[in-house]
């Protein structure tokens, strides 16, 4: 009785560099690193507020941290990465979601525009709440 050797397709470490779709996908997934950075910054801010017995000292030390040029640069990169993630997510979502209204599929543009409208509305509400 002979055993057949199972075929295992070779997979190199650079498999994702062959197609532009995979490159964009990997870049989109890499934006999570910057989300982790932003979470660390927020956690540091909470720790600054909580660790100082004087109410004003915590916010001053956190603002001093935020004014560091390296932190400013990383926050700008984080903003760009987040915007890239949002744009690609909003472009991809209507293709994945099948919303049926009166036995017809809703056009991609309607779903995409609704996502952008909700994003704009939440952003405006957040800005109003911050500056009231």
Curated annotation (Swiss-Prot):
Topological relation to the membrane, as annotated: Multi-pass membrane protein
Molecular function via GO: succinate dehydrogenase activity
Subcellular location: Cell inner membrane
Sequence intervals crossing the membrane: 30-50, 70-90, 110-130
Keywords (A to Z) from UniProt: Cell inner membrane, Cell membrane, Membrane, Transmembrane, Transmembrane helix
UniProt keyword Cell membrane, yes or no: yes
InterPro entries recorded: Fumarate_red_C, SQR/QFR_C/D
Entry's Gene Ontology cellular component terms: fumarate reductase complex; plasma membrane
Record SUPFAM superfamilies: Fumarate reductase respiratory complex transmembrane subunits
Disulfide-bond pairs as recorded: none
Primary site of residence: membrane
Pfam families: Fumarate_red_C (PF02300)
Family to which the UniProt record says this protein belongs: Belongs to the FrdC family.
Complex and partners: Part of an enzyme complex containing four subunits: a flavoprotein (FrdA), an iron-sulfur protein (FrdB), and two hydrophobic anchor proteins (FrdC and FrdD).
Biological function: Anchors the catalytic components of the fumarate reductase complex to the cell membrane, binds quinones.
Protein name in UniProt: Fumarate reductase subunit C
Organism: Haemophilus influenzae (strain ATCC 51907 / DSM 11121 / KW20 / Rd)
Gene expressing this chain: frdC
């Amino acid at each position: 009785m002979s055993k057949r050797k199972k075929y295992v397709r070779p997979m190199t470490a650079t498999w994702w560099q062959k197609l532009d779709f995979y490159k964009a996908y990997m870049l989109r997934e890499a934006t999570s690193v910057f989300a982790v950075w932003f979470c660390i910054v927020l956690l540091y801010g909470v720790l600054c507020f909580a660790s100082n017995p004087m109410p004003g000292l915590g916010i001053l030390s956190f603002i001093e941290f935020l004014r560091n040029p390296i932190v400013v640069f990383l926050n700008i990169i984080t903003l760009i990465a987040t915007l890239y993630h949002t744009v690609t997510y909003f472009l991809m979502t209507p293709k994945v979601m099948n919303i049926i209204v009166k036995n017809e599929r809703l056009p991609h543009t309607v779903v995409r525009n609704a996502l952008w409208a909700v994003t704009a509305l939440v952003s405006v509400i957040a800005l109003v709440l911050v500056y009231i």
